């Protein structure tokens, strides 16, 4: 929950692994929370994963969108996981190329070969234009990403400040990505029993779009995105506060 920044510990990971476990998925920085695991935490995870001999699939699409002068660490770089780590990335987030549909992965040769066989039958190949655009982004673009991340950090600071005095909600301060995962369960009632109902209320009555936390495994929260202008953030928070205030 928010009190532990929606993080798990190496001990919790070890306890969750059974003889049926084949892989775990790590998303850092995280969608929906924006929370990022530290190098020390990931190295502790790596020890557990190597001991269990299972795969780790590391979703690192937000690796470049990190704040407060922190640095992203890839669990795939831990030597003990050379044959167990599958790193997944893409150009959608860091380079704002969502519609180009380009992703990539790195991992053990046999795993990549199997994935390639499946991918070739499911989606065939990405468009050649998209491939060349992604190559240019990955090899030539740096300052533009830094400018974008700086803008996101300002928006993160703004939305956190605006929500700071909102009663009866809790959320972790994001380390990266561009989301807030806000626990709104104190506003639930017989009339508003869960995150889906609350998100529907905010959309239909106050015209702000949020994502119910049930989509991410926590029905107590809703996800907010600050991938928009500062003006929209200010107006959106006003509407959110008004919408929550109506619920008593």
Give, region by region, the residue ranges found by the protein language model.
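PLP-dependent class I/II
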Residues: 1-248
């Amino acid at each position: 929950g928010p009190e532990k920044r929606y993080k798990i510990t190496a001990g919790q990971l070890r306890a969750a692994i059974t003889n049926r476990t084949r892989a775990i998925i790590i998303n850092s920085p995280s969608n929906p929370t924006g929370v990022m695991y530290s190098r020390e935490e990931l190295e502790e995870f790596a020890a557990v994963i190597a001991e269990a001999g299972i795969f780790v699939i590391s979703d690192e699409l937000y690796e470049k969108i990190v704040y407060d002068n922190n640095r992203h660490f890839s669990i795939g770089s831990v030597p003990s996981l050379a044959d167990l780590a599958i790193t997944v990335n893409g150009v959608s987030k860091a380079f704002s190329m969502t519609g180009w549909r380009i992703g990539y992965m790195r991992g053990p040769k046999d795993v990549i070969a199997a994935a390639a066989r499946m991918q070739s039958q499911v989606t065939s190949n990405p468009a050649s234009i998209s491939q060349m655009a992604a190559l240019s982004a990955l090899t030539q673009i740096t300052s533009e990403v830094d400018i974008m991340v700086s803008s996101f950090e300002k928006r993160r600071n703004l939305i956190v400040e605006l929500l700071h005095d909102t009663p009866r909600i809790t959320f972790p301060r994001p380390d990266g990505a561009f989301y807030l995962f806000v626990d709104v369960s104190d506003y639930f009632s017989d009339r508003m029993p869960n995150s889906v109902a609350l998100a529907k209320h905010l959309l239909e009555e106050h015209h702000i779009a949020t994502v119910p936390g049930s989509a991410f495994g926590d029905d107590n929260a809703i996800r907010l995105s600050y991938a928009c202008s500062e003006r929209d953030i200010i107006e959106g928070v006003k509407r959110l506060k008004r919408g929550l205030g109506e619920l008593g």
